[in-house]
């Protein structure tokens, strides 16, 4: 969540979430940037990427759409990441900009495999890659996942503006940014 300049800068980076798990968008992907990895997880529906032969590739063909059901893919992605971790590998998971689809899988992985709450997992990933912002539909699915895992939830979907749903963990950031913009523009 931030200005278009920061989004542009951050979307061209590969973010290290764990020593074995990295998150990115398409922009920084080159044969050279892929050399350190043993596996890539491609979360772009229309992109069948040619990958260097040393890479294991998992393609999760999903759209960044609130109606996209991620539940059939949770365990496939988590198992792939864990297998790579156990074998000393490094996984790069990416989507178009590294903001919604791939970020959702990384946050959900931390919830499931590292026993973090949704709020804590989201905040941790956001501290590393501040542009993450899973869409509301993906947040709803992570809230359901958290409920299944822990019989409680730490994030709620709120409607602060008539008809607009926002995760409460995101709303304060949005509100603060809007107020900063108003203050800067003197309005």
Where would I find each of the regions flagged by the language model?
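Short coil/turn segments at secondary-structure boundaries
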Residues: 35, 52-55, 72, 105-107, ...
């Amino acid at each position: 969540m931030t200005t278009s300049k920061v989004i542009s800068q951050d979307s061209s980076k590969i973010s290290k979430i764990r020593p074995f798990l990295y998150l990115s968008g398409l922009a920084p992907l080159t044969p050279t940037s892929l050399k350190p990895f043993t596996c890539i997880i491609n979360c772009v529906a229309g992109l069948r990427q040619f990958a260097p032969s040393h890479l294991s590739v998992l393609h999760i063909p999903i759209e960044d759409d609130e109606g996209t059901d991620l539940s059939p893919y949770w365990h496939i992605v988590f198992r792939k990441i864990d297998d790579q971790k156990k074998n000393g590998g490094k996984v790069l998971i990416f989507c178009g900009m590294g903001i919604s689809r791939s970020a959702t899988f990384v946050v959900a992985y931390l919830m499931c495999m590292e026993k973090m709450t949704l709020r804590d997992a989201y905040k941790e990933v956001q501290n590393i890659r501040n542009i993450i912002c899973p869409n509301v539909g993906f947040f709803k699915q992570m809230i359901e996942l958290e409920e299944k895992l822990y019989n409680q939830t730490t994030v709620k979907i709120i409607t602060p503006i008539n008809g607009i749903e926002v995760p409460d963990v995101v709303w304060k950031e949005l509100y603060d940014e809007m107020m900063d913009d108003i203050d800067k523009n003197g309005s």
